[in-house]
Each structure stands twice: as structure tokens, then as C-alpha cells.
Amino acid sequence: LTIEPDQTKARLLALQIMIDKDSMEQVARLCREGLLYEPSEVMFYYYEGMAYFMLQRNADAIRVLQKGAERIAETTDKELASDLLATLGDVLYDTKLSEEAFLAYDRALEYNANNVVCLNNYAYYLSVLGKKLDKAEEMSKKTVDIKGDDPIYLDTYAWILFLQGQFEQARIYMNEALRYVEETPENAMFFDHAGDIYFRCGDKAKAMTYWKTALKLYPEKANRQKVQRKIWRKRI
């Protein structure tokens, strides 16, 4: 690249090495330089935007991903286009721009209706806001149909069913999700959700067990306080 910086294949290879090393600053640099020679290469926009998002530089991520979205053409790989727009949606939602995020997700699904990451995130964020739960349930069910051994997708689907008042169905999918997770801090929410679901199913003893597990695992004080209140009050 030092001798021939316009060699896209070599740059993409170097990019993959930096991604594997989780060196996001270098990923952003390689993409930024690559766009000087290939300003229509959507992949560079995608990875640069992703790198900025992982570096918590949301404004830069949005700027780059929006430019990339403008470069999507008929010849652009459909899965790449979908991934770029889905990532834009993730960043917009993280920046508290939910309506703009949902528009980006809708566009992402036009390019790849089976983009499970997009479907899951879109469905979950709708459920968090209590919006369009029927649409959220439909999208989430699709992720479970496509990849039914992923605990994240199973948890999302169980939670949406819970919000819809389908408690017994929610318990079935929550139990399935718990088969794939260990008691680690990053999995605390699974047990928190399980506690709520079991409480609504009338099994308060099991609910308390799951809430106590969540309390033990949650690293964030705010989440621990929320679960502690449920334990003290013995209800949601």
C-alpha cells in the first residue's frame, strides 16, 4: 500500500487484518485513505462507519454511513447495502434518533429481508419504546425461524411476547434462550427478563430465583437497583 496505495484488494486484506486485531483506529484510517482512491467503494464507508461506532464516535459514524448510503447503487452487493443501512440505524438509535433509525432499518430490509441482526435490533428497539409490537413480533419471529439457537434472538422474541401479554408462550422461548447462556455479567438481562416472565406466569418463587441471579450478575448500579426493588417488593 505504501508503494501502490490505490490497490483496493491489498487494502481490503490489510483491513481484515486490522478488524481481526480489533484495531478500530487503523480500520478507520485504512478506509479513510481508501476512499481517496475509490470514493464509490461502499465497503470502505461501511467499515469506517462501523469503526467510528465502536470507538463511540457516533457523529463521525453517522456522517460516514450516510455518505455510504448515498453511494449505494444497483450494482452494490445487496447484503453489504443492508448491513451499512442497519449499522446506520444502530448508530442513530444509540444517538437517541429513533425515528431516523427506524427509517434506516426499513431501507436495510429492502435490500435484505432476512438480515437477522437488523430484524432483531429493529424489533427490540420497537419493544423498548412500546411501539408497533405486532410488527416487532413478526420481525423477531423471523429471526427465531432463521436462527433458532441464538439466545439473543430467542430472548428478544420472548420479551416481545411478554409485552403482548402472551406469558406462557414467552416462557417457552425464554426457557429455550436460557439453555444457551451462562451466568456471566453480559447475560444478566436474560435472567432479569426470565424473572419478569415467570412472575407473570404465576411462578413467583422461580421469578425470585431469576431476579436474584440477575442482581448478582448486573455490573451496572442502575440495573441492580431496579432488580433489587423487584426483589424487595416481590413483584414487578
List each model region and its residues.
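Conserved structural position within tetratricopeptide repeats
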Residues: L1-T2, R32-L36, E70, L109-E110, ...
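Short coil turns that delineate tetratricopeptide repeat
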Residues: P5, P39, A73, E79, ...
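TPR alpha-solenoid repeat register
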Residues: A10, F44, D77-K78, L84, ...
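Canonical tetratricopeptide repeat
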Residues: L13, Y47, T87, N121, ...
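Residue-level recognition of tetratricopeptide repeat
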Residues: Q16, M50, D90, Y124-Y125, ...
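Register position in tetratricopeptide repeats
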Residues: D20-K21, M54, T87, D94, ...
